[in-house]
A protein has these predicted regions:
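Mobile active-site "lid"/loop adjacent to the S-adenosyl-L-methionine
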Residues: 170, 193, 214-244
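Conserved SAM-binding motif I beta-strand of class I
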Residues: 160-165
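C-terminal catalytic and target-recognition region of SAM-dependent MTase-like enzymes
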Residues: 241, 255-304
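Non-catalytic substrate-recognition/targeting regions of SAM-dependent transferases
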Residues: 52-120, 128
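S-adenosyl-L-methionine
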Residues: 169-211
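Conserved SAM-binding loop of SAM-dependent methyltransferases across substrates and taxa
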Residues: 146-158
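Helix-to-beta-strand junctions that scaffold the AdoMet/dcAdoMet cofactor pocket
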Residues: 250-251
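Conserved class I S-adenosyl-L-methionine
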Residues: 136-142
């Protein structure tokens, strides 16, 4: 499957086979089903092999419940980020890549190479909202990662979509995702390699009126210490400046969606620029399968 149209056709045929009680469908689906299991480091002393043993047992339990083989469970470990240290550990040596379909869009994912897979499922509602509201609008996707918001904006009929990220790897991935969904116009769908903090500061100071945006997505990492830039991002500290510069880039009645997965960020509306109104959209943006978690917070900031 190489594009969204083929994906839709495949799913339609699969559903027809299910409706016809084709006995081979379930086994085929199981062959394509994978799960990622994360172990978050526990804050107490333990035997050296305790975590690996526990993770293996949980992986087998997950495989039994999902009806898949144990080698389809990708095991990973997360440790808290401390200062400039960012730690990850992966237990699989297999290369597991492919495409997934979400709300009629198709995305390339990689379950094995990186700690994250390329698509954050907790933001499905916001992606759908972007698609609903992007029609004929200029859209800016900051810290774009693999470009999922950009795909939804393009599908929603945006007149222009710019995706900004410092990583060549993720920008290339984002381009692939746009192409998978049929969006390849280089003038309409622009990819910018830049340090977002620096780019925003310079761009917002001199932006022409006809280059401003109607919709901006600001979904930064909590912390970033890239070798490609001297800037160190700490969203708990830097969010007011980022939001202020985003607002400078908005057209009147334009909207900024600011999201963070930091539980320590202290959001204060008094630090927002003048002539803005803000609503906390967190509860409306968390899907049912993430209820009860602190997966992210989301604010809608409108310039009037």
């Amino acid at each position: 499957i190489h594009n969204a149209k083929q994906c839709v056709e495949f799913i339609q045929k699969q559903n027809e086979r299910i409706a016809a009680n084709d006995a081979t469908v379930e086994s085929e689906i199981a062959e394509r089903r994978f799960a990622v299991l994360y172990l978050y480091e526990r804050p107490y002393k333990k035997a050296e092999d305790e975590e690996e043993l526990w993770l293996s047992e949980m992986a087998q339990a997950a495989a039994d419940v999902l009806g898949i083989s144990a080698d389809h469970i990708v095991k990973k470990e997360r440790k808290p980020q401390k200062g400039a240290n960012q730690y990850e550990k992966k237990y699989t040596k297999n290369i597991i890549k492919g495409n997934v379909q979400e709300q009629n869009q198709i995305f390339r994912i990689d379950l094995s190479t990186y700690l994250d897979t390329g698509l954050f499922f907790d933001h499905r509602p916001l992606r759908a909202k972007i698609r609903e509201n992007a029609g004929k609008k200029r859209v800016l996707n900051l810290f774009c990662y693999t470009g999922s918001f950009s795909v939804y904006a393009a599908e929603g009929g945006a007149s222009y979509v710019e995706s900004v990220d410092l990583s060549n790897t993720y920008l290339s991935w984002a381009k692939d995702n746009l192409r998978l969904n049929g969006f390849s116009d280089a003038e309409k769908y622009v990819f910018t390699k830049a340090d977002v903090i620096e780019w925003l500061e310079k761009k917002s100071a001199h932006i022409q009126e006809d280059k401003k945006f109607d919709l901006i997505i600001l979904d930064p990492p909590t912390f970033s210490n890239s070798k490609s830039t001297e800037n160190i991002l700490d969203i708990n500290r830097d969010w007011p400046v980022l939001v202020e510069n985003c607002v400078k880039m908005l057209n009147p009645n334009g909207t900024l969606y600011f999201s963070t997965n930091s539980t320590k960020l202290s959001f204060d509306e008094s630090k927002l620029p003048k002539n803005t109104e803000c609503t906390d959209e967190t509860q409306n943006s968390i899907p049912k399968d993430f209820e009860g978690t602190k997966c992210h917070r989301l604010w809608k900031i409108r310039l009037y």
